[in-house]
Amino acid sequence: MMQKNLTFPLMMLYLVPWGIQCIIGNFMPVYVASLPFATEKTVGEVVALGAVITMISQVVWTKFADKSKNKNNVLVLSLILLAAFSGLFLIEGITKPILFIFVILFYSCYMTHQPLIETIAYENYSATKHSFAWFRSFASFGYAFIGLLITVLPKDNPKNFFIYSGILAILAVGITKMVPSKNIETIKTVTEKKGIYNKAYILFLVLTFMFYFCSSITATFFPVYYTAKEGIGGSVGIYSLMVSVSTFLEWGIMIVFSKTLEKMKAKHKFFIMGISGIFRSGIIFLVENQYLILLSFLFQGIWYGLLWSSVTPYIKKIVPENCLASAQGAWTVVSAGLATFAGTYAGGIIADVIGLKMLFMIISVVLIFATGLSIVLVKKE
């Protein structure tokens, strides 16, 4: 009975919130760019500010969950706040200072679900017949599915994206209530640093910074460039469809080629990943046809498929077993925090000076340099 009762809620607990990540990650830049006062620099500032607030809020919320008797209630609170703060962006006539205030409030609870859901699912999955990894895969599926769903939903007004995120947040509240709470302390902060910051790990963080610096710029400014009239002038619906196709490709790479990827050396995987990034940004820079430029999503799928199948196994090889959580956390701060902040902020400034199109040429050059360095920065196996 428990198997039948929990399988569907745990699946949906991943699928729905990661759908929110699809919406905000891809279309927050489109919304900001639609505001009358916004420039490319404004888009970069908003995404960079969101990255900083996300880093801070994750620490605060997980510590709060540690001290709470019921992690499910903490997740519910964060989702209710997320739904409420989504409504702020529906207000007419907001100014730039007000936008930044709304962004701070929104990102203070955005992405909070990720560590909390990982913990709640881990506490409950053993009551089903499925593995933890099986449930975790529905995060990628949810991201892709919602991206596909957006193609048939009204999207002419960028404010609609926040209506959708609010609806999904409320839906996630109901799903959370279907999952039993367990008072098990599974979110732990590993404070032991000895052995983490060895040469191999430091060099990997340097490579991570360079790769994410470039990928964050592409993720932030390509949707703006593709949908803007002064850019490619493409459809938001087509862009959303290709986000889904790319994510399904990413998922497929991890499933179909899992055994092959396990046998490949890390430096080869990161080198191929870098090459795919070069093709991705190079196509965006060189191609102006609104359909041919979508070939860049093929290389985006390869990029992320290799990334998510390579990072954790490689970290396990270069840091002590008792430091894995701390090492993974530091990697996340560099990738999702520092590199994303630096990339989006710098990208906005550069785009204001030389234009969006030339921005992707610069990314290609940086990626050529980073890809070459990957041969040196990734430890021999």
What residue spans do the PLM features occupy?
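Juxtamembrane intracellular "pre-TM" segments in multi-pass secondary transporters
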Residues: M1-K4, V179-M210
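Helix-loop boundary and gating motifs at the non-cytosolic
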Residues: Q3-A51, Y201-E230, I238-S240, W308
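Hydrophobic core of transmembrane alpha-helices in multi-pass small-molecule transporters
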Residues: L15, F85, T95-Q114, F209, ...
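Central cavity-lining transmembrane alpha-helices of secondary-active solute carriers
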Residues: E45-K63, L241-V256
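Helix-to-loop junctions at the C-terminal end of transmembrane segments
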Residues: I56-N70, P154, G252-K265, A351-D352
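Structural signature of the two symmetry-related core transmembrane helices
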Residues: N73-G87, H268-I283, S364
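Cytoplasmic helix-loop-helix junction between adjacent transmembrane helices
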Residues: I104-F138
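Symmetry-related core transmembrane helices of the 12-TM Major Facilitator Superfamily/SLC fold
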Residues: N160-K177, M358-L377
